[in-house]
Structure formats: structure tokens, C-alpha cells
Amino acid sequence: MGWLSRLLGREGADDDSPVAPRMLDQDARRAQLGELEAALEELVTAMDSPPSPVENPGWVGRIKDYNHHLGTTTMLQKQPVTREALVELTAGMRPLFTTGQPVPAGLEHLVPLSDRVITLTRQLEEPLPSEA
């Protein structure tokens, strides 16, 4: 026990016992993951179709990123969903276009698809009422 603990009056209050993990609502989380999977499939298909700049290496990289997230989402639905797996999935998800920047001409149809993916991703980050 350090002097700071004594100063703050926490003498003997150290509790290093493990914290019980909060259980996730498996059915609800799988349903959310199913929605995200469908949205990602739609976005990837649209990104890989004309008039998208598929000859641009950066664009191809973004398609690969979303395909990776799609694979992770599919895999998570087939096993017990954990908080760590959800964090890993959602932490790497980013919008297709930078907010506040103009969207390149001809790619406006991708904005609602990307927004849907990000909205569903943010919902996965929030605890459900059944998980309280």
C-alpha cells in the first residue's frame, strides 16, 4: 500500500479479485451480426462494381478491409460472441468516405451503404438492455 492510498483513505480496500465478465445476449448479438453481414456484402458488391475506381490500389485495399470485416462477422455468428471479439471487429471499422469531405463524383450511391455499415457497427458497441 502506497502513501497515496493512505492519503485518499483507501487503506485495506484493495480488491484484486477477478471481475465476473458480463454475459452477452447471444441471440440478439447474432441477429445484429447478421444485419451487419448483409450490409457489408451490399457495400463490398457496390464498391467492386462500376463506376467504382477498382484500378486504384487504395480502393482495392478498402475493399479488402471490408471483405476482412465481412469474414470476421460471418465467423462470429458461428461461435460464442464475446465482448473482445466485438471490440476487435468494431474498432477497425471506419467510414468509406471522410465525414465533411466531398464525395468523389459517381460514388454518391455508396454513401448510404457505408453509413448503414457504420450505424450497425456502432450499435454493436453499445450494451443491450438484456445485457445489463
Predicted regions and their residues:
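Long, low-complexity or tandemly repetitive, helically biased scaffold regions used
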Residues: 21-24, 28, 41-132
